[in-house]
Amino acid sequence: IAVLERLKPGKDFPPFTAEDLNGKPVSYESLKDKLLYIDVWATWCKPCIKEIPSMKALQEAYKGKPVTFVSISVDQDKEAWKAAVQREKLSGIQLYTNLSMNRDFIDNYDLSGIPRFMLVKNGKIISISAPRPSDAKVKELINANL
């Protein structure tokens, strides 16, 4: 219950650190002054993969607008993640965290399943369970926060 209380709209978004494609750590601090649409996914997750075309279309629709797309892979196999990013030509900020080494990530976001989409603005939670890219409601939510 304490976790759910912490993740309500308007609360501070819990910080994270994850790796980029070059293995360089990227901290949430460097992104927190923006509107972020965050996607937590993995290469082995079929519903996650199914969202890729819709995610690409969503990113295209918001090109040049003040929204930053951040995808965080929770794959066990870092190379599988890197290969998928290349193969699918994924854009936006692509990050990786190994859940077995990063239990905090699961606990901080009450991550019981993926894909998980979150919308965060200026460090505050808008939605910890935002609509998927394939859901038309996602544009309403993003537009209301631009």
Feature locations, PLM:
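Short beta-strand segments
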Residues: 39, 69-73, 95
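N-proximal helix/coil linker or "cap" segments that precede and/or mark the start of modular domains
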Residues: 1-24, 29-31, 60, 79, ...
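Structural microenvironment flanking redox-active thiols in thiol-disulfide oxidoreductases
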Residues: 50-88, 100-107
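Conserved redox-active cysteine motifs that mediate thiol-disulfide chemistry
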Residues: 32-57
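Thiol/disulfide oxidoreductase modules built on the thioredoxin-like
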Residues: 90, 97-143
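Active-site acidic short loop of glycosyltransferases
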Residues: 32-34, 64, 90, 111
